[in-house]
């Protein structure tokens, strides 16, 4: 039963990362000044 909990936790983390990546892409498209430095790094990360 403990293994099942880890699987669920892993899925939740992956979903959160995907949502975060989507938010990042939207922010980068908007060219928000705060995100400009992070966006430069973000381009090297293959989402």
Curated annotation (Swiss-Prot):
Subunit composition and interactions: May form homooligomers. Probably interacts with the periplasmic domain of PhoQ.
Protein's organism: Salmonella typhimurium (strain 14028s / SGSC 2262)
Topological domain ranges for the Periplasmic compartment: 27-47
Transmembrane parts of this sequence: 6-26
GO cellular component, one term: plasma membrane
Coiled-coil segments: none
Tagged with keyword Membrane: yes
Homology family: Belongs to the MgrB family.
Pfam families xref list: MgrB
Role this protein plays: PhoP-regulated transcription is redox-sensitive, being activated when the periplasm becomes more reducing. MgrB acts between DsbA/DsbB and PhoP/PhoQ in this pathway. Represses PhoP/PhoQ signaling, possibly by binding to the periplasmic domain of PhoQ, altering its activity and that of downstream effector PhoP.
Keywords: Cell inner membrane, Cell membrane, Membrane, Repressor, Transcription, Transcription regulation, Transmembrane, Transmembrane helix
Name the UniProt record assigns to this protein: PhoP/PhoQ regulator MgrB
Localisation per UniProt entry: Cell inner membrane
Keyword Electron transport: no
Membrane disposition: Single-pass membrane protein
Regions of this protein lying in the Cytoplasmic compartment: 1-5
InterPro entries membership: MgrB (IPR020907)
GO BP term, example: negative regulation of phosphorelay signal transduction system
């Amino acid at each position: 039963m403990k293994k099942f909990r880890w699987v669920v936790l892993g899925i939740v983390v992956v979903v959160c990362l995907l949502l975060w990546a989507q938010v990042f892409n939207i922010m980068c498209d908007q060219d928000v000044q705060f995100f400009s430095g992070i966006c430069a790094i973000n381009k090297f990360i293959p989402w």
